Amino acid sequence: MLKLLLSPRSFLVLQLLLLRAGWSSKVLMSSANEDIKADLILTSTAPEHLSAPTLPLPEVQCFVFNIEYMNCTWNSSSEPQATNLTLHYRYKVSDNNTFQECSHYLFSKEITSGCQIQKEDIQLYQTFVVQLQDPQKPQRRAVQKLNLQNLVIPRAPENLTLSNLSESQLELRWKSRHIKERCLQYLVQYRSNRDRSWTELIVNHEPRFSLPSVDELKRYTFRVRSRYNPICGSSQQWSKWSQPVHWGSHTVEENPSLFALEAVLIPVGTMGLIITLIFVYCWLERMPPIPPIKNLEDLVTEYQGNFSAWSGVSKGLTESLQPDYSERFCHVSEIPPKGGALGEGPGGSPCSLHSPYWPPPCYSLKPEA
């Protein structure tokens, strides 16, 4: 109706005046987590600054450590320039609805990156409202609402002790500080010196666990961690692991070097065996097959013991393999004594005495002058 009564120029002037006066708008951003909501509050500025985009502030993450203190941190490196952001907080259901500033800031490279809130200021089951703000640009601020009972991280269990309930049954007990036992859920892990992986079991409420059957020849290791259970909250954050405890001191633990040696030798030995089998298989494939015993009858009956003909070996190859025992003869003739005729026998012929194998040449002596 106002737009119809005013001219376009008058309506534009009225808009500019309203913008200079400064109106605030509130935008509610929803997220996938129903427990966390953020209210982004932007204050209008002069028209010449409206075109510049407002950079969002980093998200604040809060965790309550064993209900002793709470740390709320943010990523200070996400800012384009080094900025000391300020944090204010309050509880939604409280008499005082005003924000109070953090009294103990955490720093990263001399830039504020978190806030530590002490135990007396923690109200676990009231909605925690936290506001992050840029002091240089007051229009840059972000508000988040958190349910602290879902953000509790317990301290690691302590004083783990083992006792024998019977000859083959063990009981493990431990303690937790500052948190009621009914509000905690435990994860117990154990293994022996012959196991490669952990066996784990969830234990609710009571800080004890029994192992019904143990082997005296093994050495067992136990450890425990905890989290806030669904009765008191729905935290998914586990505590750190407790210090491990052992049972079976008379058993010598496996030497890690032997395990490493086994881990190397077993694969290498397996590969060597496979390669050897492959070579043996290829060698057997190249060897001719051994004929059945009944086929040997042909060697005696049909081929009359001629193995070469029976096996199919060529005649030329057979002859080349046969040994040659022939020898060349050496011919020897006797040298006559000095002054006598060479080879002259009783018959007066120089050829009457000679080797029986071949006729030697005949010689005649030339008389001396």
Swiss-Prot record:
Motif Box 1 motif: where in chain: 286-294
Cytoplasmic side: 285-369
UniProt key word Membrane: yes
Domain of life: Eukaryota
Side of membrane Extracellular, spans: 23-263
Pfam families cross-referenced by the UniProt entry: CRLF2-like_D2, TSLPR_D1
Glycosylation sites: 71, 75, 84, 96, 159, 164
Subcellular location: Cell membrane; Cell surface
Chain span(s) of sequence motif WSXWS motif: 238-242
Any GO BP annotation: mature B cell differentiation
Major place of residence: membrane
CC per GO annotation: cell surface; external side of plasma membrane; nucleoplasm; plasma membrane
Annotated transmembrane regions: 264-284
Topology of this chain in the membrane: Single-pass type I membrane protein
Annotated signal peptide: 1-22
Disulfide bonds: 62-72, 102-115
PANTHER family with a match to the protein in the record: CYTOKINE RECEPTOR, INTERLEUKIN 2 RECEPTOR SUBUNIT GAMMA
Function according to Swiss-Prot or TrEMBL: Common subunit for the receptors for a variety of interleukins. Probably in association with IL15RA, involved in the stimulation of neutrophil phagocytosis by IL15.
The name this protein goes by in its record: Cytokine receptor common subunit gamma
Organism: Mus musculus
